[in-house]
């Protein structure tokens, strides 16, 4: 859907061999660029000497994981692809490695409740407002009104960054690879944008509470969890939606009447699909049904102290979702042909039940799953079977995934898929055998590659086809990343700089500048990893790298060989 950095998409490159350089490469990497340009953009699934079992193992690791890490190919070949898939479908049975569990335990945000996160953000916003007022009132006052303001901004920046830490650490190192792939898929399906206000601090909670527990559970449970999470309520503004006249009665300055954003997107994107048979009137009626679905309000600390209520028992529940009957439209409604009698919050629960069980929802989700795991153009017969399985099991996502991986369409290695930037970066780090304690450079790389983590501003999420991601500039950026990673120039084991800018926007810019320096320096920066061993890399990837590419690698200067593997057309497909 989105071109890379505004460049026009060039889907034709996906269909034709490349006989000239794909794009101007960095001149000091001329040897790598010349060799990469000579390779042909076509499927390179090589099952000759490696054998059918190894090829099948590679296939499932590329489709159901973020590619093989060292030892994965041998392990899956020995145990069999079917046994590995059965293991992946029950991630709760797989223990996390101690190093990963330790890094996750060190994160602060997962221990914070929604209420605490929202309170911190609002107190930061209040401090910023007071500082701005002070600057306006006094020309020589150029600093925040209190030292607390700077501390608060640092806390918010840490929460913002920890969402990415938690996601990437698990995607790279967890043995529960299918779960991680599905977390990415379903977060993208129920997308929220981390850059919007309150969602700066809520995205981690949203993924941990509303997405991750449900990726192999019931779709209805995930639909309800996302609908009620404050990250979604805030992102699509349903927390402000009120029945006509309610704002005047309650004097709610921020409530501007009926808001249709969530009602529209939950049908168009989350359930029925754009061709799901609903009308604009259905959107309006569903918006009326969902009035009153909001967040419990928490006043900033300064106001609580002023009112003598700082220690008031406001509760420490995990959720701040609340139904406000004074905002709800209690009139009769007709939606999707259903007469909906007044029933408060249960009207919304009825609507979500109906959407989760609708045949159009089954088909829409089946099509998206087939596109993600099988082909850019989903096979119609597979979509039919997955939709039927979804309906027969009342939206059991584990059963649907089992049907998908058992299908002949999934087992067929053709056609191949072109990796998104997210898949490319993760698979490159995993294949290189790098155990990272600092994923922030990878977050910066994802931004440079056009797919910032949690950075899709529109509710439809990132698209997942070759036409969306294959263009000359994008390939140039990928080769540059492959070169920096392979040569050990990325500081993936660097301890965070305590003097980094406090704001998350400044922090991301600093990471991007650091990534730029890493890409152009001849020498690794502090905290960089060792150069990638090309022999170990080729052993890890096995039949993924074609005979032709291996020959090109052998003719390349040793210092560039691992970069050529990671920047090859073979590696950019899965």
Regions found by a protein language model. Give the residues of each.
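Amphipathic alpha-helical segments that form the core helices of the histone-fold
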Residues: 73-92, 204-215, 386-392, 550-554
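Flexible, low-complexity segments enriched for small/polar residues
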Residues: 48-72, 358, 362-393, 402-574
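Acidic, Ala/Val/Gly-enriched low-complexity intrinsically disordered segments
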Residues: 11-14
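Intrinsically disordered, low-complexity segments enriched in serine/proline and basic residues
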Residues: 3-9
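Active-site substrate-binding loop specific to GH73 endo-beta-N-acetylglucosaminidase modules
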Residues: 200-214, 218-434
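Sec/Tat signal peptide C-region and signal peptidase I cleavage site
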Residues: 42-48
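N-terminal accessory alpha/beta regions
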Residues: 72-182
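N-terminal secretory signal peptides and thylakoid transit peptides that target proteins
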Residues: 17-36
């Amino acid at each position: 859907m989105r071109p890379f950095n505004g460049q026009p998409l060039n889907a034709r490159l996906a269909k034709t061999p490349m006989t000239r350089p794909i794009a101007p490469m960095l001149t000091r990497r001329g040897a790598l660029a010349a060799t990469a340009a000579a390779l042909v953009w076509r499927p390179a699934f090589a099952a000759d000497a490696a054998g059918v079992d190894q090829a099948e193992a590679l296939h499932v690791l590329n489709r159901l994981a973020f590619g093989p890490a060292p030892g994965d190919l041998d392990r899956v070949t020995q145990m069999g692809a079917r046994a590995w898939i059965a293991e992946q479908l029950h991630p709760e049975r797989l223990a996390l490695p101690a190093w990963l569990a330790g890094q996750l335990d060190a994160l602060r945000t997962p221990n914070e409740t929604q209420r605490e996160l929202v309170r911190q953000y609002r107190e930061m916003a209040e401090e910023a407002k007071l500082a701005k007022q002070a600057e306006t009132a006094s020309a020589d006052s150029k600093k925040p009104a209190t030292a607390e303001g700077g501390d608060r901004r640092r806390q918010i920046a840490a929460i913002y960054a920890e969402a990415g830490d938690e996601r990437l650490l698990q995607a790279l190192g967890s043995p529960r690879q299918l779960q991680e792939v599905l977390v990415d898929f379903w977060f993208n399906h129920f997308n929220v944008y981390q850059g919007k206000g309150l969602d700066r601090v809520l995205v981690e909670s949203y993924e941990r509470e509303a997405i991750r527990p449900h990726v192999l559970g019931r779709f209805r449970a995930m639909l309800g969890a996302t609908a009620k999470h404050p990250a979604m309520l805030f992102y699509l503004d349903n927390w402000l939606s009120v029945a006509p006249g309610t704002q005047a009665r309650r004097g709610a300055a921020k409530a501007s009447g009926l808001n249709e954003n969530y009602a529209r997107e939950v049908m168009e994107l989350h359930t029925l699909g754009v061709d799901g048979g609903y009308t604009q009137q259905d959107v309006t009626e569903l918006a009326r049904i969902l009035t009153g679905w909001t967040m419990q309000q928490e006043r900033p600390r300064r106001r609580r102290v002023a009112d003598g209520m700082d220690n008031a028992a406001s509760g420490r529940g995990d959720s701040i979702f609340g139904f406000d009957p004074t905002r709800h439209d209690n009139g009769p409604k007709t939606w999707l042909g259903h007469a909906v009698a007044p029933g408060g919050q249960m009207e919304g629960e009825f609507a979500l039940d109906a959407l989760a069980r609708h045949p159009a929802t089954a088909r829409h989700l089946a099509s998206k799953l087939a596109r993600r795991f099988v082909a850019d153009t989903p096979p119609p017969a597979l979509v039919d079977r997955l939709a039927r399985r979804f309906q027969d099991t009342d939206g059991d996502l584990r059963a649907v995934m089992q049907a998908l991986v058992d299908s002949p369409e999934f087992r067929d290695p053709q056609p191949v898929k072109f990796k998104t930037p997210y898949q490319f970066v993760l698979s490159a780090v995993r294949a290189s055998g790098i155990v990272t304690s600092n994923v922030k450079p990878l977050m910066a790389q994802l931004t440079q590659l056009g797919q910032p983590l949690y950075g899709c501003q529109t509710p439809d999420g990132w698209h997942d086809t070759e036409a969306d991601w294959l263009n000359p500039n994008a390939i140039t950026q990928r080769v540059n990343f492959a070169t920096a990673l392979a040569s050990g120039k990325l500081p993936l084991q660097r301890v965070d700089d305590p003097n980094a800018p406090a704001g998350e926007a400044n922090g991301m810019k600093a990471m991007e500048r650091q990534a730029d320096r890493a890409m152009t320096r001849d020498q690794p920066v502090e905290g960089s990893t060792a150069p990638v061993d090309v022999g170990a890399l080729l052993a890890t990837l096995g039949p993924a790298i074609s005979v032709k590419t291996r020959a090109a690698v052998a003719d390349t200067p040793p210092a560039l060989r691992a970069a050529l593997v990671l920047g090859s057309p073979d590696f950019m497909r899965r």
